[in-house]
A protein has these predicted regions:
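Short, Lys/Arg- and Gly-enriched loop/turn segments at beta-strand edges
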Residues: 49-56
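Short, conserved charged micro-motifs
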Residues: 77-84
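Interdomain signal-transducing alpha-helices
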Residues: 70, 86, 90, 129-132
């Protein structure tokens, strides 16, 4: 079967690839909007708001309920925005505030897909995005060890 991403599969900026649920290939073919077949960001929109991770597109999967995908507007031949940059941006204080300013506090926090679409993200030139991602990936593991 085709694995189904649930909110618990997106934790602390990483994907947990142990799946509890799968759907048959025939059902998958009937649900193209929830298919994930290329690199994108995944985020729960109920419960753990702001918990985002990059899906590398290395296998076919599906979105479970309460998990959304963020596909960036890159062309097939040219990259303008790095998924890893958007991940780090949305995990930053400013990016998290931008993402969560639309959340609804009920029994479980939630954010609508339309609200996610309206999040403003500062996008520097591609080379600057690469430098930012590389520096964060170099420094943050050291910071984690110091905790």
């Amino acid at each position: 079967g085709i694995p189904l991403f649930k909110g618990k599969n997106v934790q602390n900026g990483k994907l947990v690839l142990s799946f509890e649920s799968y759907i048959p290939e025939s059902v998958s073919d009937e649900l193209p909007r929830s298919q994930i077949t290329k690199k994108c960001l995944l985020t729960p929109y109920v419960g753990t708001i702001g918990n985002i991770a990059v899906f590398d597109g290395s296998f076919k999967a599906h979105l479970g309920s309460n998990v959304g995908k963020i596909e960036l507007l890159n062309s097939d031949t040219q990259t303008f925005i790095l998924e890893e940059y958007v991940l780090w941006y949305l995990k930053s204080t400013y990016g998290y505030a931008e993402l969560t300013k639309y959340k609804k506090a009920t029994a479980q926090e939630s954010i609508s897909i339309d609200a996610i679409r309206n999040v403003v993200i500062a996008i520097p030139p591609l080379e600057e995005q690469r430098r930012i991602v590389a520096k964060l990936e170099e420094i943050l593991p050291l910071c984690e060890r110091l905790k």
